[in-house]
């Protein structure tokens, strides 16, 4: 069963071997967030690469943005899951990561 963690700023979701199952994000409807999700234990941890490449999401899009096309079993992360978040104009964003 997958767990989840909600972030509103850059940070670690989980440290250690795990599976990434996807994410959703909600915005303030004005300021576009830029998100990168990596196989990394923390800010100074070993980086095994991007799980979700850096992408800017349209804050004016209706509904939630998120990851599609992931394998049903998730993506294996050896080091953990780390999310880098920035928001144009200093707006607000919530990113919920699903993992096991």
Feature-to-residue mapping (PLM):
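Surface-exposed, low-hydrophobicity beta-strand/loop segments enriched in small/polar/acidic residues
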Residues: 1-100
């Amino acid at each position: 069963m997958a767990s989840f963690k909600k972030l509103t700023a850059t940070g670690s979701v989980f440290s250690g071997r795990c599976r990434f199952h996807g994410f959703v994000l909600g915005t303030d409807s004005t300021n576009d967030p830029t998100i990168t999700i990596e196989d990394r234990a923390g800010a100074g941890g070993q980086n095994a690469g991007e799980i979700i490449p850096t992408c800017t999401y349209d804050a004016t899009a209706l509904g939630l943005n998120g990851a599609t096309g992931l394998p049903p079993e998730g993506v294996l992360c050896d080091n953990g899951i780390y999310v880098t978040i920035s928001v144009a104009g200093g707006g607000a964003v919530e990113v919920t990561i699903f993992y096991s």
